[in-house]
Amino acid sequence: MRAGERKWGGWRQPAAIAVAVAFLLPLWFMVSGSLREPGLPPPRAPELVPSPISTASYHEAFDLVDLTLYTVNSLIVAALTVPLAVLVASLAGFAMLLVAGRARVVLIGLSFVALMIPVTALLVPRFTMFRWLGLIDTWVPLIAPALLGLSPFYVLLFYWSFRRLPRELFEAARLEGMSPFGMWRRLGMPLVRPVTIAVALLAFIASWGNFLEPLIYLFDPDLYTLPLGLRSLETLDRTNYPMLLAGAVVATAPVVLAFMIAQRYFLHEDRGAGWLGR
């Protein structure tokens, strides 16, 4: 090990602990605040553990609005959005790998251009299109972006991951008569599994926390997703901070759980699974 590596190596663990504390403290205070008695104002000083501990705020939040229904709605939308986004983004990324010459450069450039377009710039055209199709007040406008890979970033991420694989692998498969779809399914996807899981997690977070599009397209309360449910909760009782924090915990818990399940695969060095971490 070099002297510079030894010098910085001693700081890695303390730095990692500091970053972890910076991210975990807000979550801890959110959970702690949700366990206070309903209606209490925020504490004047940071409170690691409330006294007494009460779950009444959770009961009150679920009684005030139908958080169970909104959670199920969000899960349904995410369950449809995430697989579609992964499928389309991976196919598009692999197709970019197979395109040769200047066409590939043009496609990459167009992807970067699309990536820089603000989402808000597309709201009016999208709303006009979905209204013309009669799809307002349905979940289709929330799921439809997944048919385009949800984000050009996911397409580029798959393309870069496929590009890191040995070209000889695909050349040999082509000589054996394997179709492009077969190469994607049998060679490409198994070897970029960490990237697939990362894209799935990012797509889940984007779908789960999507507030603006449900606010624009959904009017029936029975179709509301969880972010809109939290907005309804805040509208009905905006000064009940423990109850609002309880709703925030309900909305945050699935994302944290998904990350805890998926994070061990991100840089997993296994057979063909370490391409992302090299």
Task: Name what the model sees in each region.
Residues M1-R6:
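Short, Lys/Arg-rich, polar N-terminal cytosolic tail immediately upstream
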